[in-house]
């Protein structure tokens, strides 16, 4: 006789199933399970008296004959493509299969084989996401990487050489020698890393040598002079070598206005950093570019979301980051020109409309490296509270599935696509590197339970190492075995240009991590940004700074209280 479980008992045992809803942290966001790949009555679960035992849910099949290295059981996947309950099989550091795990000798519909060589990780009641991608990193100090991975970030893209004045302000690793040294330093860390060369030059040779040395892209920054000539040259070199260009435009409008910069793009694809403008860019109307089909717009997290504190903290941040002097009136005027409540408020709504495609940090250079994921979901929550259910399909779903998928894409798949690495990372899809985060729903977006890097646990919540069990206080994120020695080399990637691989730069430098080439960056458009491809016509009033999208005024109130904040942190 089959045994019938009530829905609550089932969820407590195997996790939620189709139709169940889950609250994300302490936000007003609720997601609903759309599909369940597991088979009722045939679920696998590890533990004493449970299913994954020899002759039951575990088969005698060797790994060489098809058993996986790691199975995550009964997890709820939240990704841009869906919200589904499934087992996840990981083999050779990659996602092998999303489906039903077990023993094919005694269970039906098994496509993930559990054998004696299979490790088990309980995903019951947990949310599984792709590791985050932060595509706006100032590599000012290596300690950023520890903070980032502890928050759920597994890929970091940007530039810098340490706390040099240039790096403090601009995301560039300038010149072959500096690029070589940073590529060598990348071997020390359990995350995927890629470096952007300096793109500011009106002649190509200085840019070509940086791409050939291993830069995975180029960065144009106003502090180095983002003139129309430099933009044109940089994009021309990028087109030749198939790398992405990121840009921080000319706040002071010295070399031209936003229209001149758009003209210099010549319809070529480009990633615009902090597209609202508080982080830098044509004042007051750089935000217009988010309506251009060739522009891939991102935000940095200090303006995410708009709160009653946002404006006040930005002025001090800006003075420090851009080497400005509060005693010089012109420097103060420069700073004040970038901070506008109207465009920051509009940025919230443009994210909710899918017109802004990505969110990143701007680490230690007007951004917090450990808060990309938190700020993304705080923005989503604020928009739910202020704008209601986001339901463009017009169906009757009461949950926030569409909004959740739109927002998770902003720090996972979309930056991966933008920088030519989506074939490797950026989503929970078969064949990709198993860079994954497991979250307790109550801590979703705030503190991951486990960060898996290339199929191995790299960071995890862990209690007192001298305790008799893993859970006694103090419990906090700590590096695990995947973060050490050769394991970090085997489970992480370094992203470089195809030209660098052809020049055998990785072997010349003795790199231990696998170096892989970015590709497909120059054929992109805004339409390639998953669930974030809207192209509204943006107008900015030059006197009031009011923003309109397709004629509609974009205005919202600042948040006075946010979830995912003091409830979770002592400091």
Swiss-Prot record:
EC nos: 3.5.1.5
Hydrolase found in the keyword field: yes
UniProt keyword list: Cytoplasm, Hydrolase, Metal-binding, Nickel
Subunit structure of this chain's protein: Heterotrimer of UreA (gamma), UreB (beta) and UreC (alpha) subunits. Three heterotrimers associate to form the active enzyme.
Protein name in UniProt: Urease subunit alpha
Localization in the cell: Cytoplasm
Post-translational modification: Carboxylation allows a single lysine to coordinate two nickel ions.
Binding sites annotated in the UniProt record for substrate: 221
Catalytic activity: urea + 2 H2O + H(+) = hydrogencarbonate + 2 NH4(+)
Cellular component GO terms, alphabetical: cytoplasm
Residues binding Ni(2+) 1: 136, 138, 219, 362
Keyword Transferase among record annotations: no
Main location: cytoplasm
Cofactor binding notes: Binds 2 nickel ions per subunit.
């Amino acid at each position: 006789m089959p045994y019938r479980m009530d829905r609550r008992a089932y969820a407590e045992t195997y996790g939620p199933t189709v139709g169940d809803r889950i609250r994300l942290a302490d936000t007003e966001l609720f997601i609903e399970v759309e599909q369940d790949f597991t088979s009722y009555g045939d679920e696998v679960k590890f533990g004493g008296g449970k299913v994954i035992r020899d002759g039951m849910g575990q088969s005698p099949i060797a790994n060489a004959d098809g058993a996986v290295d790691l199975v995550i059981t009964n997890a709820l996947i939240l990704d841009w493509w869906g919200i589904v309950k499934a087992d996840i099989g990981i083999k050779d550091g990659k996602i092998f299969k999303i489906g039903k795990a077990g023993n094919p000798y005694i269970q039906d519909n098994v496509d993930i084989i559990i054998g004696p060589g299979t490790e088990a990780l309980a995903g019951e009641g947990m949310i599984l996401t792709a590791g985050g991608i932060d595509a706006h990193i100032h590599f000012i100090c290596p300690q950023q990487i520890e903070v980032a991975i502890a928050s759920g970030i597994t890929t970091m893209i940007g530039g810098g050489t340490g706390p040099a004045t240039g790096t403090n302000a601009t995301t560039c690793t300038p010149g072959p020698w500096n690029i070589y040294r940073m590529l060598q330093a990348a071997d020390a860390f359990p995350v995927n890393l890629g470096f952007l060369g300096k793109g500011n030059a009106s002649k190509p040779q200085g840019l070509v040598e940086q791409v050939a040395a291993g830069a995975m892209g180029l960065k144009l920054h106003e502090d180095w002079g983002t003139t129309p000539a430099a933009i044109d040259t940089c994009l021309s070199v990028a087109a030749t070598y198939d790398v992405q260009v990121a840009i921080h435009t000319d706040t002071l409008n010295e070399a031209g206005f936003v229209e001149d910069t758009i003209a210099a793009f010549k319809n070529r694809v480009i990633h615009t950093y902090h597209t609202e403008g508080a982080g830098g860019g044509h004042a007051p109307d750089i935000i217009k570019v988010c309506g251009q089909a060739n522009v891939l717009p991102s935000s940095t997290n200090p303006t995410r979301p708009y709160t009653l504190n946002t404006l006040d903290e930005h002025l001090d941040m800006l003075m420090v980051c851009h080497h400005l002097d509060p005693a010089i009136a012109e420097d103060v005027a420069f700073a004040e020109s970038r901070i506008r409540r109207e465009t920051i408020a509009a940025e919230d709504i443009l994210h909710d409309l899918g017109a802004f495609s990505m969110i990143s940090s701007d680490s230690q250079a007007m951004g917090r490296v450990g808060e990309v994921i938190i700020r993304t979901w705080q923005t989503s929550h604020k928009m739910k509270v202020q704008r209601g259910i986001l339901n463009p399909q017009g169906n009757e779903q009461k949950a926030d599935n569409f909004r959740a998928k739109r927002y998770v894409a902003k720090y996972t798949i979309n930056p991966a696509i933008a920088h030519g690495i989506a074939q490797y990372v950026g989503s929970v899809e078969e064949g990709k590197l198993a860079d994954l985060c497991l979250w307790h729903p109550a801590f979703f977006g705030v503190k991951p339970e486990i960060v898996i890097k290339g199929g191995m646990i790299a960071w995890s919540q862990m209690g007192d190492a001298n305790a008799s069990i893993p859970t006694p206080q103090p419990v906090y994120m700590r590096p695990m075995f995947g973060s050490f020695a050769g394991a970090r080399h085997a489970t992480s990637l370094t992203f470089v240009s195809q030209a660098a691989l052809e020049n055998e730069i990785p072997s010349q430098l003795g790199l231990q991590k696998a170096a892989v080439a970015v590709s497909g960056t120059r054929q992109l458009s805004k339409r390639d940004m998953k669930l974030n491809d809207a192209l509204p016509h943006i107008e900015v009033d030059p006197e009031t700074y009011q923003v309109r999208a397709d004629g509609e005024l974009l205005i919202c109130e600042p948040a006075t209280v946010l979830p995912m904040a003091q409830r979770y942190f002592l400091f």
